[in-house]
């Protein structure tokens, strides 16, 4: 099967209050316990990723008084705790500007969006952003873009390869009702390829890559045929 990304770290947390209101707290800060020696940092290091390699965070950003400051503070505080260099921007994808309120499926869209970022190297615009809440000025790492921004190499809209290094990693959080938080760090699929090559050799990697690319091409053909009415999509 093709690999769209590698889970570098995943965990769920609770704040302890467990009050069922849509004002998530900061329980996911526990991902940074230990700072530069936290499990988050150590797990990513096994895949060759440092805190400064994390390029983007995909957040809900509900435009509510409770969510936006909390979620932004969470990621900015974590960035400092795990040793991200001062001045290294952490670009933000505000999920709900792209899909609206997806309810329980929101973080699935966020994770899928990160895999698309690995493929394209382009951060989507927060198109509906008129101004950033002044409360977020304290969060010095966080950057919201209003236009698509290419930050790495990948495929353009015509499938052509563009120059640049791949985007190594991104974060996604799901801060839900009841003060229960989900946190995932996703790593570029190149980490999977490196693991296959190390374990089974370059020949095995090329064999997998050939099968995976054939499956991707077949899926794309099927999608386009369905869009043109030449085949049933489902």
Which residues are covered by each model-predicted region?
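Short glycine-aspartate micro-motif
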Residues: 4, 56, 126, 170-174, ...
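Conserved phosphate/anionic-ligand binding catalytic regions in large, soluble enzymes, centered on
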Residues: 101-107, 174-184
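A beta-strand-loop signature enriched in Asp, Gly, Thr, and Trp
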Residues: 39-58, 68-98
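Glycine-/small-residue-rich "gating" segment that lines the acyl/pantetheine channel
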Residues: 1, 142-165
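Short, well-ordered loop/turn and helix-capping segments at boundaries between secondary-structure elements
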Residues: 80-81, 114-124, 186-192
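Condensing-enzyme catalytic core mediating Claisen C-C bond formation in acyl metabolism
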Residues: 1-49, 55-56, 185-234
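Acyl-CoA/ACP chain-elongation machinery
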Residues: 1, 10-27, 59-69, 86-144
